[in-house]
Amino acid sequence: MREIRLSGLMSGDGRRGALLPRPSSTLQIKGKKRHVLVDTVGLLLHAVVHPADIQDRDGGVLVLSSLFGMYPFLFKLFVDGGYQGPQFYSAAAAILPQLSIEVVKRSDQAKGFKVLPKRWVVERTFAWFGRCRRLAKDFENLSRNAVAFLRLASIRLMLRRLCNPS
């Protein structure tokens, strides 16, 4: 039996709510953040959706706490600069002690758009999700519905890759 070692990439994406008529002002959604954990190919492993008033660092702790026991073969995690800080690192060490975290940051001298290594895989996954009509804009009132549609879109992508290997 061979040991499987998986590297994952985690990033967040902000999504603004759709401008749909609501029955009351209490249901008005201002925005949500989607944190996804993908493998090195860009396929979804895990997703968490929460209100946009939570910082990326705290959202990363939410993602890691919901991962407990799910991926024992996850050994390396590439994250973007928003997931830095002692709180995130201590939570990662407590939840997944075998996990090694590497922060992919932009250089200070870079001007304009720059493709970052490893980070483009997550951004490409968000672009794939953007092709799905229900994920192009946030139409969901509940976060669990948004996660369900992320998973459905990921299943659709995986099936399309299996059926069309070209």
Report the location of each language-model feature.
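N-terminal polybasic/positive-inside topogenic patches
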Residues: P23-T26
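Basic, amphipathic alpha-helical segments enriched in Lys/Arg and hydrophobic/aromatic residues
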Residues: R2-L9, D13, G17-A18, Y89, ...
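Polybasic low-complexity intrinsically disordered regions
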Residues: I29-E102, R106, L150-A153, S166
